[in-house]
Structure formats: structure tokens, C-alpha cells
């Protein structure tokens, strides 16, 4: 997901390129320079310890912007963690996170600075809002395969992508209609009590409240938006099953969403095993805030990850969808699209 390279006379200070940005996503790392190809790498005229960069031939890349970006990336790749933090601090950027995250953050800072001179970043501003949803559902210890999960908490966190602030939240508990008694395991895991679900509305009633709330926010009409989840299960399993149980058609506005685990793994180049909520927070230098497995608290923490990723230059975009009742991936090569205005789905006949 990134790269390119520059044509500067050997021996001259091409470090000015480092003030501009890093390589675009999708390229390759520049090769390590040989002694005769290298010189000290500089940021704002200051040398980095032992960091070097290479000059490149004019035929390597057609656009000099990307040549400069590639040279910058090579320098950043060879910086120590302390150097990375110092440079990030200098630009008043977040300094928490593991080394790979710090490198990605600094590269994207330089990349954005340079590319802003060429063109506006369409994807960054495409969605005005992101709705983070993390359902809680009935469960039993060991999750036996025959157990039917019913949604018992419906939270939504409204993230403004321009201010990077949580603008509002929605939370409603839901009364289950098949397994009406919560298991001790479920109560302990989620913190949701039997009394809370007994006094709650049924799923169709809660879904109607969610949709009315989203309409008040003018999502899909005045503002472009997308849903975002931590994994595929919230939409492809929990919402899908719940709609069947409640005899509702699957709501069109929930057919496509951003799976932040996929976005995180692709952006920071980490394996799937490193994309659990607590691990993502840890790698970004953050602690979980709130009660784990509280749907609203989980959603707020997912929003914190989304904010950090946007700050680091990630283009959060729809990457999963439901089609004919099946989970499918959405290619990043397709045009970016928004989510339709929320509408209450019809009941099945």
C-alpha cells in the first residue's frame, strides 16, 4: 500500500524533499543504498543519526512528487523510535504507538503535505459522518453452535470526520423474545441486567428509534455517512439473524459498512491476529476506556481508533457488504460510495 523516488544530483542536499511527504500507498520500499549512492538524511536541515537516502535515475518514476516521497520514506524507515517521536512531536503529532505505527504516521504527514499541493484528498472528506455500531447479544458460555443470538443492546456513536469529535451517541437496550432470560454468563460479560432487558422495547421498536435518530441527524440526505463495525459479525450475523427473528427485511442502509479490522490491518500492515479491539488500542498507544463488552463503551473505543487512523492518513471506506444474504468484500478499486438514507424496513410476509 505505498511508494516511489527522486532525481537529485549526488552530494547535494535533497533533504528538502523530506519536508514534503512520504510515498503513496501501493508502492514498494526503495532499495537500500550502496555506500557510493548515499548521503546523510536531513529533516529541516538536521541530520538523523546514520539515516541515509539514495538518489534515483530519472526513469524510476515519472512524477517528481513521488520521487521525493520515496526518498522521504527511505529515511523514515531507517529512523530510530526516539527519532520518530522527536520528529512527530516537532510537528505536534501524536507520539504514542509502536514503531511501525509511528513510521506510518510520519510518512502520511509528509505525504499529505506534499499531495495537498497537487490535489485535494477526496476520500478524507467524502464521509461527513461515520456511525460506529457494536451490538451486544444474548450468549451462553462456550457459545454452543445451536444457540440463537438476539440483540440486547443497540448503540450508535456519531463521529464527525471533519472535527474528529464524537458528536452524539445513541443507546437502547432490547428485549429478547426467544431466550427471554439472560444467562449468568451473559449478564457477567455484558453488564446488562435482566431488569434492563425486561423493561426494554422489542427490536423492531428500537430499530425505528435508531432510524428516527439518524434522520434527525440528516444522514444520507444533507450529510454523507457510512456505518463502521469492529469485524463482520455485527451486520452479517447479529443484525441478519435478528431481522429474520423479528420478521423484518434486512435494512438497505445497513447492507454496506466499514470493517475497521480490515482497514487497520491493511493500513498498518499487520496480520488479522493483531486486529482485535484491545490490541489495536495498545498498538496505537491507548488504553481501553470504559467497561469491555458494554456496547456503547466498545463503540466509543472503536471511534477512538477510527480517529487515530484518520489522523494517520488512512482513508476509511466501505469494504464489506451483504448481498443476497451473504457476506462479501468490497474492492478498494471501486468508486467510493455513501450509504442511503435510513428507512424502516418492511415486515416479511
Curated annotation (Swiss-Prot):
Q: Which CDD domains match?
A: ERI-1_3'hExo_like (cd06133)
Q: What is this protein called?
A: 3'-5' exoribonuclease 1
Q: Which Gene Ontology MF annotations are present? A: 3'-5' exonuclease activity; 3'-5'-RNA exonuclease activity; histone pre-mRNA stem-loop binding; metal ion binding; ribosome binding; rRNA binding
**Keyword Magnesium applies:** yes
Q: Where is this region: Disordered?
A: 1-48
What is the relationship between temperature and activity? Optimum temperature is 37 degrees Celsius.
Question: Where on the tree of life does the source sit, at the highest rank?
Answer: Eukaryota
Residues noted as binding AMP in the record, renumbered to the chain = 136-137, 293
Q: Which GO terms describe its biological process?
A: exonucleolytic trimming to generate mature 3'-end of 5.8S rRNA from tricistronic rRNA transcript (SSU-rRNA, 5.8S rRNA, LSU-rRNA); maturation of 5.8S rRNA; regulatory ncRNA-mediated gene silencing; rRNA 3'-end processing
| Active site: residue positions | 136, 293
The segment(s) forming the SAP domain are: 76-110
Name of the coding gene: ERI1
Protein location:
Cytoplasm; Nucleus; Nucleus, Nucleolus
User: Known catalysed reaction(s)?
Assistant: Exonucleolytic cleavage in the 3'- to 5'-direction to yield nucleoside 5'-phosphates
Quote the record's domain comment: The SAP domain is necessary for binding to the stem-loop structure of histone mRNAs and to form the ternary complex with SLBP, but not for 3'-end histone mRNA exonuclease activity.
What GO cellular component entries does it have? cytoplasm; histone pre-mRNA 3'end processing complex; nucleolus; nucleus
What does the activity regulation annotation say? Although it can bind simultaneously with SLBP to the 3'-end of histone mRNA, the presence of SLBP prevents the exonuclease activity.
